[in-house]
Amino acid sequence: MIALIQRVSEAKVVVDGATIGEIDRGLLVLLGVEREDNIEKMQKLATKVMSYRVFSDENGKMNLNLEQAGGSLLVVSQFTLAADTGRGLRPSFSGAGTPEQARELYEAFIDFCKSKGVNTQTGQFAADMKVSLVNDGPVTFNLQV
């Protein structure tokens, strides 16, 4: 399971001209599901995302996690993160989870984060989305479990 996280000062997702998810300070999470992923991996990754210290403390050092920084999550499904780009000029998605598996783990990720008290906004699974953000830093990390 893959989470490409970006520290943002704001981010939003638009589908069919309507904003469906929007946050101020927090993390934009692009979430990719691979074939071997399961609930245990999802919980481990969600915990890592929420606990990862990417926000600056009073000394300017990246030392605060999402909760300590008072941030929110915007979680967007992103199956292309599971692409194999090692050969040729066209990505292969054979390692990506099935749509059913991906939807289940995406929704479970969101529910898990919400259950921990994190303000969690979302995109729309399998939709054509317009994602906009202001990357704060820029700070971007690729987390995998």
UniProtKB/Swiss-Prot annotation:
Keywords: Cytoplasm, Hydrolase, RNA-binding, tRNA-binding. It is an enzyme of class 3 (hydrolase). CDD domains: Dtyr_deacylase (cd00563). Disulfide bonds: none annotated. A motif (Gly-cisPro motif, important for rejection of L-amino acids) lies at residues 137-138. The keyword Cytoplasm applies. It is found in: Cytoplasm. Its EC number is 3.1.1.96. It catalyses: glycyl-tRNA(Ala) + H2O = tRNA(Ala) + glycine + H(+); a D-aminoacyl-tRNA + H2O = a tRNA + a D-alpha-amino acid + H(+). Its main location: cytoplasm. GO terms for cellular component: cytoplasm. One of its GO terms (biological process) is D-amino acid catabolic process. One of its GO terms (molecular function) is Ser(Gly)-tRNA(Ala) hydrolase activity. It comes from the Bacteria. Homodimer. A Gly-cisPro motif from one monomer fits into the active site of the other monomer to allow specific chiral rejection of L-amino acids. Belongs to the DTD family. An aminoacyl-tRNA editing enzyme that deacylates mischarged D-aminoacyl-tRNAs. Also deacylates mischarged glycyl-tRNA(Ala), protecting cells against glycine mischarging by AlaRS. Acts via tRNA-based rather than protein-based catalysis; rejects L-amino acids rather than detecting D-amino acids in the active site. By recycling D-aminoacyl-tRNA to D-amino acids and free tRNA molecules, this enzyme counteracts the toxicity associated with the formation of D-aminoacyl-tRNA entities in vivo and helps enforce protein L-homochirality. This is D-aminoacyl-tRNA deacylase.
